Amino acid sequence: MAAGFKTVEPLEYYRRFLKENCRPDGRELGEFRTTTVNIGSISTADGSALVKLGNTTVICGVKAEFAAPSTDAPDKGYVVPNVDLPPLCSSRFRSGPPGEEAQVASQFIADVIENSQIIQKEDLCISPGKLVWVLYCDLICLDYDGNILDACTFALLAALKNVQLPEVTINEETALAEVNLKKKSYLNIRTHPVATSFAVFDDTLLIVDPTGEEEHLATGTLTIVMDEEGKLCCLHKPGGSGLTGAKLQDCMSRAVTRHKEVKKLMDEVIKSMKPK
Amino acid sequence: MEEETHTDAKIRAENGTGSSPRGPGCSLRHFACEQNLLSRPDGSASFLQGDTSVLAGVYGPAEVKVSKEIFNKATLEVILRPKIGLPGVAEKSRERLIRNTCEAVVLGTLHPRTSITVVLQVVSDAGSLLACCLNAACMALVDAGVPMRALFCGVACALDSDGTLVLDPTSKQEKEARAVLTFALDSVERKLLMSSTKGLYSDTEQCLAAAQAASQHVFRFYRESLQRRYSKS
């Protein structure tokens, strides 16, 4: 009977739960879904991570290749993210060129990388003016159940922490690059940006980590990306109902706690992986 | 038929330094707005902020493709064309921001199963482009007579490395700044409708408060420009 009511009046069904300060899946308004992360599962990629936020699953693979730097930045490498939302993850996506959602997510991840300075592009330089590393970060969503931006940011961070670049020397006689696959080193990750997404309901209520259905019923969304010093890398609010300054401050404090949780989880996973 | 209105909006009195047109306080550049300049769209507006200029045209409410129609509201579409080159992923991201902002204010339920299309063309970019696009879109929607629950305006601010806030930054100020924040605020309660930020910063409250104060000037400019237009005819 409840299922019938849910189909006919989804918003009313939802409001009944919100009145009791909880959600249909039993979570509180400020509670995140269970987050699990698996690092280093793809052996063919230089770095990889799989993140599950409840049902939302995103896998990130990082491949490093050589490239010639551009003339106006001869000592800077490139980090090229791409988010793919294939028809596999949800019925709303069709096959073909990337839709708007995928493009917006790709631009968001590119902005986070650029704003947070997660990797110093100068670290990716092998020989100024001649050879630099380019890191292709491919994020593929395997299951879309809302809050794709948080999952993608986490997957990207975990994968970059897993990337090992081999040592490259330029042979002076032949001017060719020699790759020493036996000597690999991790990337220097300077900051750890963590995203926290909120959905706005009925212009007043804010809930954390919306599922797919909640995102559909929400009147607005907000994503805050914070690094460990409490600095904001990105305050992404793509329209939707208005928010007052006070509500914004509440969201920021929630984002700070989330950052601590995520960082702890990631440190645990990396520590458990080290003896290889 | 055309109305051109200019105004100088200032928040604090300038010190009158000759080298930079604005002091380290908060003041907006010279605004200008021209409405109803294109003959084909239902509404059009050109918004100028200093040297940044955006032309907006609105078609709607018009017929919508069955695949895109929503049974109880109007379908809003935003197309943003850059000055040079083909539209890319960055334009798609901006289109989404502008579209969601417009969806929050436009009363779509009055025109179900129709489409409202906002087309924006960047004429020149000298900083604060997203804010200028938002202002142009709002003026064009007003010119087209699309019912809205509030007006909205875009305000950009830049934070440089020593923490000073500059409103409505030029391209040079944007490049040198530590962070550039663009906000869209509504006219009724000055609530935050849209926010898009670039760079690393920690003080949102101060920027938001400054943007809210600046938005008063922008809304006053809207009101004056519309009053002047309708009082003559």
From Swiss-Prot, chain A:
GO terms for cellular component: chromosome; cytoplasm; cytoplasmic exosome (RNase complex); cytosol; exosome (RNase complex); fibrillar center; intracellular membrane-bounded organelle; nuclear exosome (RNase complex). It holds the Pfam family RNase_PH. It is found in: Cytoplasm; Nucleus; Nucleus, Nucleolus. GO terms for biological process: exonucleolytic trimming to generate mature 3'-end of 5.8S rRNA from tricistronic rRNA transcript (SSU-rRNA, 5.8S rRNA, LSU-rRNA); nuclear mRNA surveillance; nuclear polyadenylation-dependent rRNA catabolic process; RNA catabolic process; RNA processing; rRNA catabolic process; TRAMP-dependent tRNA surveillance pathway; U1 snRNA 3'-end processing. Keywords: Acetylation, Cytoplasm, Disease variant, Exosome, Neurodegeneration, Nucleus, RNA-binding, rRNA processing. Its main location: cytoplasm. The modification N-acetylalanine is found at A2. InterPro entries: ExoRNase_PH_dom1 (IPR001247), ExoRNase_PH_dom2 (IPR015847), ExoRNase_PH_dom2_sf (IPR036345), Exosome_comp_Rrp42_subfam (IPR050590), PNPase/RNase_PH_dom_sf (IPR027408), Ribosomal_Su5_D2-typ_SF (IPR020568), Rrp43 (IPR033196). GO terms for molecular function: identical protein binding; mRNA 3'-UTR AU-rich region binding. Component of the RNA exosome core complex (Exo-9), composed of EXOSC1, EXOSC2, EXOSC3, EXOSC4, EXOSC5, EXOSC6, EXOSC7, EXOSC8 and EXOSC9; within the complex interacts with EXOSC5 and EXOSC6. The catalytically inactive RNA exosome core complex (Exo-9) associates with the catalytic subunit EXOSC10/RRP6. Exo-9 may associate with DIS3 to form the nucleolar exosome complex, or DIS3L to form the cytoplasmic exosome complex. Exo-9 is formed by a hexameric base ring consisting of the heterodimers EXOSC4-EXOSC9, EXOSC5-EXOSC8 and EXOSC6-EXOSC7, and a cap ring consisting of EXOSC1, EXOSC2 and EXOSC3. Belongs to the RNase PH family. It is linked to Pontocerebellar hypoplasia 1C: A severe autosomal recessive neurodegenerative disease characterized by cerebellar and corpus callosum hypoplasia, abnormal myelination of the central nervous system, and spinal motor neuron disease. Affected individuals manifest failure to thrive, severe muscle weakness, spasticity and psychomotor retardation. Vision and hearing are impaired. Non-catalytic component of the RNA exosome complex which has 3'->5' exoribonuclease activity and participates in a multitude of cellular RNA processing and degradation events. In the nucleus, the RNA exosome complex is involved in proper maturation of stable RNA species such as rRNA, snRNA and snoRNA, in the elimination of RNA processing by-products and non-coding 'pervasive' transcripts, such as antisense RNA species and promoter-upstream transcripts (PROMPTs), and of mRNAs with processing defects, thereby limiting or excluding their export to the cytoplasm. This is Exosome complex component RRP43. It comes from Homo sapiens (Human). The gene is EXOSC8.
